[in-house]
Amino acid sequence: VAYDVFGNGKTSVKVNLGKYLAAADGSSITGALTNPLSRISTSVTRTWTDTNKNFKPDCDLSNPLAQNLSTSGGDVCGQISNLNFAKPVFSNTYDPAILHGSGLRPYDWNIGVQVQQQLLPRVSVNVGYFRRWFGNFLATDNLSVKASDYTPFTVTAPADPRLPGGGGNVISGLYDVNPTLFGQTNNFITLADNYGSQTSHWNSVEVNLTARVRQGLTLQGGTSTGRLTTDNCAIVAQLPEATFTATGSLNPYCHVEPPFLTQFKGLAAYTIPKVDVQVSGTMQSIPGGTLQANLSVPTATVAQSLGRPLAGSAPFATLSLVTPGSVLGDRVNQLDLRVQKVLRFSRARVQVGVDLYNALNSSAIQTYNQTFITNGNWLTPTLILPARFAKISAQVDF
C-alpha cells in the first residue's frame, strides 16, 4: 500500500506485509525427508583412540558396542552414535499432524513501513523500518530418553585476555545423556510449540538517499542497522538433546541477542559529456561476521563437573566459549571503480571497460581460525580480501 500524503507527489508512505512459507520441495517434510529410506540410519559416528599409534582403527568395526582392546595391542573404540544403524528400523518418525492440513509449514512474516520524501528536484530520501518473524518451528524429541536422563554440567572457560571479560567464566546449559542410553534413537519430529515457545525476530532500520543530478551524475547511498534475536530456551528445558548440533558439538546458548550491526553502501556514476566516458564506483562497509571460540574439553575435565566420563566413550566435548554475536570480525571496507567508453563504428557498438576491484588494496580479514587453544592461534586470519586487481572487458553489439 502506498499513500501520497500531501497529494503533491513529494511525500509518500508505503507499507508492505507478506507471509512466506517454506518451500514444499524434495528437502522438506513433504518430500524426501519422509521417504522411508531417509528415515533409517545410513551413517553413524564413533570415537576412536589410536592406542598403538599405527594410524588405523584396530577394533571390530562390525561390533556397534564400545571396545577396549589396548591390552591386546588394539585400540579403543566407542559405541556407535545410533544403535539403529544398518537395521530396518526407523530412526525418525514424523507427527501425522504436521504432514496433513493447512497452516503447518514453517513460515515467516515480513512487514515494512517506509517514508519517502523529496528533498530537492531529483533528490529524495527513504527511511524504513522492517520486521521479520518466523513460526512453525520443528522440534526433534528422542522418545528413547527423557529430560531426566540428561545430566547437566558446566565448563569453566580458560583465562585468556582475548576472550570477553578475560575468560574464567562458568558456562552452563550443557548436558550429557545417561551412558546406558547412549545411541538409542527414536526421534519424533513435531511442532516446537508442543514443548514451549520458540521465537526468531529480525528488526532493522534503513536510510537511503538517491540523487539524480543533471548532466549524467547519479549518487546513491544508505545505511542499514539491524539484528536477529532468537530464543528456544523453553524447548531446551523440555528437550535437552536440542543443545546438540548436527556436527556433535554443544550449543548452550538458547537465547541469542547480539548487538545491532550497521552497514554502509554507496555508489556514484557520471558520464563525461562529449567524450561519452562513464566513470562509476561502489563503496561498502560491512561489519565482520560472528566468530566462535571452539574449545575441545577433555572428558577428564568434564568429569569434574559431570561426575563421570562422557557417554559413548567420547574423549572430549566441543563447545564455543563465547555467546554468538559477542565477538565479531573486523569491519570489511571495499571500494571498486569502473571506467567505460562506448565506441560506435557504422552499425556496430563497442563498450570497452576497465574494472578496478579493491581499489584501496584493503587486506580486510574475511575468515578466521575459530578453534580456541590457550595462547594458541585463535582468530588468526585464514582468508583476506583479494588484493587489488584490474580487469579489461569489451562488449560488441552489431
What does each of the following model-derived ranges do?
Residues A2-N194, L306-S326, D330:
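Solvent-exposed loop/turn elements at secondary-structure boundaries
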Residues G128-T290:
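Gram-negative outer-membrane beta-barrel transporters
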Residues V13-V15, V115, V127, L209, ...:
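Membrane-embedded beta-strand positions of outer-membrane beta-barrel proteins
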